[in-house]
Amino acid sequence: MRFEEIVLPGVVLVNVGLEKDLEKPLEELSLLAKTAGYEVRAILTQHKEHPDKAYYIGTGKLLELKSVAEATESEVVIFDNELSGTQLNNLVQALLVASCVYA
């Protein structure tokens, strides 16, 4: 009998804000992603007072996120922040991921 390896779609979780511990709110989001059938492969945070109009995150963090998504072969990026339609579209185009969503 042969068992095939099941590879779950990879996801990167992102949180932006001014809170001291930006990873804590991502614990619940991580559980939700796992329940939905995703494997959380990375978590990124950014302390930022005002969101960038184009990407929500700054351009330096955008480059880091793209690098992490590529290195971990993650197809999905989930933000724990509310993004505009323009920001979502810009992120998908810049990151070359299957989808970018916010929770």
Where does each model-flagged region fall?
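N-terminal accessory targeting/assembly segments
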Residues: 1-103
